[in-house]
């Protein structure tokens, strides 16, 4: 279940993933190993499983007026670290099974397999090699044409190479090859393939301030569906991080994004960036506020979207065993560009407020209990895409405690 599918040639294990697994295995003889198995269960109720506006639409979509359902998720997995010299090899494998009470056709399994290497050479070179593959149910809120179960296979191959040019200057580079199989109604082989390159130069000459310039270049294509095709995207940003004190910190980026998608559909030219602020009020309480504006791919219809997002997160740790996380979010989305036949995107604008609550209770060193509540609402100028829903659940996770750090 945790291996790579061999349904088709492109679903096999990538060469880089196999090589990293082999490297991880070979390191066991010469490094310090930490193996952390875990298992858990999660039961939740979702008041609007298919993210539909009302029961009348549900009848048209699947013949059933019911919107909500409960499901039980069971999970088993492990994390493993190998440390030797200045290098770190790590792996994470996880299997999950979801069983739905009413909509039995939605019951399914998922998995995650990830392996990576953080390496350092001398005092000036460092980097990362990371490979991952995940099987996951597609979110219905992001699927324009279906209420049936759809399974995505998401793969990443990431390489990072960084140089400390001088005590004050650092050059960071990375390449991410991303391959997503995302079948939708009438197009079972639909997906997205993209390669994203990143380079950033940072000045670190001040103790509490760093700044620099970053550039990203993405070359991608939507595949195996008519009308949609390739895109090219460039992002240029001025970046900054600032620690005002031991209690407050800021991070920010401002720049421009240009996305060109075939036939002048999905082209976006916009000012983009992010701004974040973190404040520790005490040893128990902190708040994080961030705003971002970014151009993203809309996999549900093969187009582009411009998203503006505000997040506010409050963390409260009253005791060693208990932590509370409160969050509110608002997302404004404008959709552009190519659309797969049967979908409706061009001119669509959404507003999506949400709120969340999670209690982390560390009952024992190896036992975590997490009740949670999430609320999500979306209003759209295309009424079919408006919905609201609440998810209430509890997760129980048993995990071998990590050994104390030396």
Predicted regions and their residues:
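Cleavable N-terminal signal peptides
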Residues: 18-19, 29-30
